[in-house]
Amino acid sequence: MKIAIISSVYEQTPPLRYGGIERVLDFLVKGLKTKGHDVTLFATGDSSSPCNLVHFFDHPVVPYEPNAQIIHSQKACRYINEHNFDIVHNNVDISVGLKDLLKVPMVHTLHMDVLSKSKQFIFSHFKDANYVAISDKQRQNAESYGLNVVSRIYNAIDVENYSPSLHRGKYLAYLGNFAPFKGPHIAIEISRKTGIPLKLAGKVNAMGKEYFEKEIEPYLDNSNIEYVGELNDVEKREFLKNSMGVLFPSTWDEPFGLVIIEAMACGVPVIGFPVGAVPEIIRHGENGFIAKDVNEMCSYTKQLSNIDAQTCHQYVVNNFNVERMANEYEAVFNKILNTKL
């Protein structure tokens, strides 16, 4: 198949640091290429994913400019219509309307919260598009809003670049964005209640700056609670492997949560709340714990050493590898093309 994949203009594909969607798309490109498909990626010019690259912006657009993605997607649409593609895989919500302008079928993967007001405003006009959900919970939310979900495909990571930790460290880890709904302030509360050191890593963007300054910074002492900055892939794996466990205190319907499987691939268990896709990914007592509240999270920190590192790692190898993800997307593309015929 000749496949067009539309990525974002706000990060490279793959990203140097932050950028879960762009990272997953890079893995998908590699998986589809391995299967012999002709893949063209529409991304920023400094992207390094190993395929045909078409770009309209040389570098990620910073600061955020919403019109940049619209321009990128419209130009991609024109290019696709002129170059005989078989199918389009779109990953940018604001571009879902391209389905009515393209000469070939389009599949749109939902990466974000489909029930937010801004997303509903977009999706309400295109409920009949071919949507892929990245978790059962997200699929449930999308279908409750009337979206045409053709499949659920879990994200994947490059498991061959991960190995289980042989010697876990003595700190709890938080890895993610700094926003209230992500819960880093909850991670700090758990550290303070249990007395276990906490290291926080992730990007502080413009929207999260005030929250970080008010809710995170006052507790940083570089001893018990430390912010280590935004990490690249190598640094991230070391950060996770050297922890005793990862806190995933998200309080919203997280569509997936890539850090959960990244941690487990390092042989490190994860503690999270029963929201979004968390109950689908964490197997309670086997590769982590699902806590109903902060007190339960604190309690489960005492049981982290009971979780086997190899069990965590193998779970990700078996269920969240790139080959599985590529096979499932290939099946969806074939299904859409055969339906069209």
Where would I find each of the regions flagged by the language model?
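Catalytic cores of nucleotide-sugar-dependent glycosyltransferases that transfer UDP/GDP/TDP-activated
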Residues: 1-341
